[in-house]
Design a protein with these regions (language model features):
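Short beta-strand->loop micro-motif that forms the acidic, two-metal-ion catalytic signature
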Residues: 50, 65, 71-73, 83, ...
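Alpha-helical scaffold within the catalytic cores of cyclic-nucleotide enzymes
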Residues: 69-70, 100-119, 150
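Short regulatory alpha-helical coupling segments
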Residues: 6-7, 20-38, 69-77
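Regulatory sensory/coupling modules that transmit signals to nucleotide-handling catalytic cores
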Residues: 1-3, 113
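Conserved nucleotide-binding and Mg2+-coordinating catalytic segments in signaling enzymes
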Residues: 5-25, 44-58, 66
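Catalytic-core segments of nucleotide cyclases and related cyclic-nucleotide turnover enzymes
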Residues: 54, 58, 102-106, 132-165
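A short pre-motif secondary-structure segment
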Residues: 81-84, 123
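Active-site-flanking beta-strand signature of metal-NTP-handling nucleotidyl enzymes
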Residues: 40-45, 82
Length: 166
């Protein structure tokens, strides 16, 4: 019974991913177990969720959220951990460097593009992703690292908006 309650308290009901609490606990554990190693923290955001919900309904918005969770988990693979930490926000943590962060970001874009071209959905599923490289250790505060990755996401969103306007 305790295992079931623990699972439910750390899982996101919509996506089956870790929720914020579960992700933070797992990230702290990974940090503790990998002192001195480099890790990439990715912070991702589903683009245009409000417009999807407003135009096509919350069932479609939920579908887009689930699809984003699947795409991110697929790109990260078994070497890392992913979670949905808020409404349309996702995080991942995996061993690697900046090149790995860029590779994951590009893979997610390719998977979203593939889904969008094959889908009969009247909207696009797209994720903006920022990442931050850390060196694990006892002095690392995971919430601070997530803030840094969130700032990188914000910069990525600004760049993407500018490139779309051109």
């Amino acid at each position: 019974k305790n295992e079931v309650l623990n699972f439910l308290s750390e899982s996101d009901a919509l996506t089956g991913s870790l929720n914020r609490r579960g992700f933070m606990e797992k990230a702290v554990q990974i940090n503790r177990e990998n002192a001195g190693k480099e890790m990439v923290i990715l912070f991702a955001d589903l683009d245009h969720l409000k417009e999807i919900n407003d135009s096509f309904g919350h069932i479609e918005g939920d579908f887009a959220i689930r699809r984003c969770a699947e795409v991110l988990k697929s790109a990260v693979g078994d070497s890392g951990v992913t979670g949905r930490i808020g409404g349309d926000e996702f995080c991942a943590m995996l061993p690697g460097n900046a090149g790995d962060g860029q590779r994951i970001r590009e893979q997610v874009r390719r998977e979203c593009d593939g889904f969008n071209s094959d889908s009969d959905k009247p909207y696009y599923v797209e994720l903006s992703i920022g990442y931050h490289v850390i060196r694990c250790g006892s002095d690392l505060v995971i919430s601070d690292v997530l803030k840094d990755a969130d700032e990188a996401l914000y910069e990525e969103k600004k760049k993407r908006r500018k490139s779309v306007k051109k």
